[in-house]
C-alpha cells in the first residue's frame, strides 16, 4: 500500500498507509490520546476522525481542550440531535438545514403546527435522552441516486432539493446516530455521549423562509446555544440577561431618543434627545477629521444608473439598491436612478474635477454621506440594522508608496476616536487575497505588506484572515469589544486600485505622465445609527457626559425655589452645559426616579437651604448619596465635563 507522510504541529513527521484515519493516528500516538480525541485538522481543514487521509498532509489531533474545534463539533452534533428529537416527538415534521452559528446553532423545520415556548422544554428533555444513549455517530458516502431515492421515500423534499444543488463532484456524506440520519458535510463527534448534556439550552423560535426566499415556504427555526461546560453556558446566559438590560431599543424608549414605525421600515425617527447625540458626535468627528487634514464634501443621494454601471455596483449590488424611475419631461424612456448605497463613486467624481498633480496627494476626502441599502424586513434591528443610514465615510487618494503612511495615520486617528468614546479594547484583522481576484501576486504582496507595516508602525498587532479580502484589494477591519464581551466590527480600511481605473481617476506624476491613484476607503464609526446603538449598549445608557443629550436637570424641592432653579439653569447653559429645569409640583424623589430612568447624568436638587446658601445638592446617576456644593464649583466642574475631549 502507498505510504503518506503526516507532519505534526511540533514539526515531526511519521509515515502511514494511505487511507489511515485520524482516529487511527491518535491511537498510534497513545491510548490516552485515542480516548480523548474528538477531531483533527488536516491541511487547515477541520476533519472527522473517521475520514481517511490519502495524501501527505499537516495534521493536528484535537481534544475537548481545543475550544474552537470542540464548540463547533458540540454545536453541530446538537443541531442533529435536536432535529432527531423533534422528529421523534412529531414524526410528520420535515427537516431542512441546521448550521452552526456564533455561540450555537439553529435548525429549520417544516411543521403544520407552530412550536410553542413550552415545546422547547419538551425537545430539550428528549435531546438529553438521546445524549445519554451514547450512540455511535457513523458516516457513509452515498451515490446521488441512492440519496435522492432515500429522501424521496422518506418524504423529505427539502433534502432532495439540497442534493440537487450540491456540485456533482462533491461526495454526499450521510451521518447516523441510532436509526436517525442526516445529509451533512461534517465533521461530528464519535458518539452522542460526548456532547455535554448540561451545557446547552434552546433559546427561541422564529420564522424563516426556505433559502431566504420570501416566495418559498415559511419554516420554523429553533435556536440553541451550547458550550464545552455548564459554567460557560451560565456565563453566556448571564451576558444575555445583561444585554437585554442594555438593549438600545429599550433604552431608546426610556431616554426618548428615537422611534421606528411601519410607514418607514428600517429608517429612524430621531427625537430631540437622540438627535442631540447624533449632532454632538458628528460635530466631534468633523473637528477630528478637519484636524487630520480631510476636506469635507457632500454628494447627491440620487444618482443615474449610468454611474453605477460604470463603477460596477449595478451588476454586483443592484439587489441591495433602491431604484427610482423618473419620467424626465415625458421622455420616451424613463430615467433610471438609484439612491446611493455608498459614497465612493461620487467621491471619485469630485476628485476628477480639475487636473490633479502628485503634489496634491494624499488627498483625504470625507463625507457624512446619507445612504440607502435594502435589508430584508426580518434582518432589521432597531437602529443597528437599518435601510437608511449616514456613514462617516472617507476616501484617501494616494500613491502606492503612501499606503503605509496613510494607513498608519488613520489607525492613530481611529485609536483616538475610540478612546474618546470609551472603547479601549479593540483589535485589527487583515483580510488577504481571495482566490478570485484582479491584479498580480506582486501587487497583492505589496498591498498586504503595506497594511501589515502600517499596523506595526502604529504600534498594533493584527490577526490575518486568509482569503477574506475583496477581489480588488486587502482590507483592515477594526473590531470593538464592549463591556459585556461582545464584538462589534465598526472601522474599516480597504485598499482599492479597481474603482479609480473604472472611473478614470488620474493624477500627473513627477514624470509628467498620467497615473492612477490608489483609493483607501475608510470609516471609523461605520454608520452613525449603528454606532450610536453600540454606544448606548456599551454604556448602558450612561453616556460620557459630553455626549449625554440631557446633561443636567435642576429640580425644585419646593416651589419657592423655582426662581433659583431657573437661575442655576441659565448659569449652566451660559457655561456650555445642557441643563433644564424641573419645577413641576411633584415630590423630589419622584423627579429623581424619573430622570434617573432617562439616564440624566446629574440631578441638582434645590430647596430652601440651597437658595439661601447659593448651593446645589448634587446627585450623580448611579449614586445614592448627594453632596451639597457651591454653584460656582459645580458650574466649573460640569463645564469642563461637558467639553468634548478634542477641545480640552
UniProtKB/Swiss-Prot annotation:
The family database entries (Pfam families) matched by this protein are listed as: HGTP_anticodon (PF03129), TGS (PF02824), tRNA-synt_2b (PF00587), tRNA_SAD (PF07973)
Q: Where does the UniProt entry say this protein principally localizes? A: cytoplasm
**Which residues are in the TGS domain?**
1-63
Q: Which reaction does it catalyse?
A: tRNA(Thr) + L-threonine + ATP = L-threonyl-tRNA(Thr) + AMP + diphosphate + H(+)
What the entry lists under SMART domains is as follows: tRNA_SAD
**What EC number(s) does this enzyme carry?**
6.1.1.3
Alphabetical keyword list: Aminoacyl-tRNA synthetase, ATP-binding, Cytoplasm, Ligase, Metal-binding, Nucleotide-binding, Protein biosynthesis, RNA-binding, tRNA-binding, Zinc
Which cystines does this chain contain? none
Subcellular localization(s) per the UniProt record: Cytoplasm
Q: Which domain of life is it from?
A: Bacteria
| GO term, biological process aspect, one | threonyl-tRNA aminoacylation
Q: Tell me if Glycosyltransferase is a UniProt keyword of this record.
A: no
Co-factor: note:
Binds 1 zinc ion per subunit.
Would the keyword Transferase turn up in this protein's UniProt record?
no
**InterPro entries recorded for this chain?**
aa-tRNA-synt_IIb (IPR002314), aa-tRNA-synth_II (IPR006195), aa-tRNA-synth_II/BPL/LPL (IPR045864), Anticodon-bd (IPR004154), Anticodon-bd_dom_sf (IPR036621), Beta-grasp_dom_sf (IPR012675), TGS (IPR004095), TGS-like (IPR012676)
Its required cofactor(s), as named, are:
Zn(2+)
Residues at which Zn(2+) binds: 344, 395, 521
GO function terms (MF aspect): ATP binding; metal ion binding; threonine-tRNA ligase activity; tRNA binding
Query: Which residue stretches belong to region Catalytic?
Result: 247-544
Task: State the oligomer form and interacting partners.
Answer: Homodimer.
Spell out the family assignment given in the record's similarity comment. Answer: Belongs to the class-II aminoacyl-tRNA synthetase family.
| Biological function | Catalyzes the attachment of threonine to tRNA(Thr) in a two-step reaction: L-threonine is first activated by ATP to form Thr-AMP and then transferred to the acceptor end of tRNA(Thr). Also edits incorrectly charged L-seryl-tRNA(Thr).
Query: What's the protein here called?
Result: Threonine--tRNA ligase
This protein's gene is called thrS
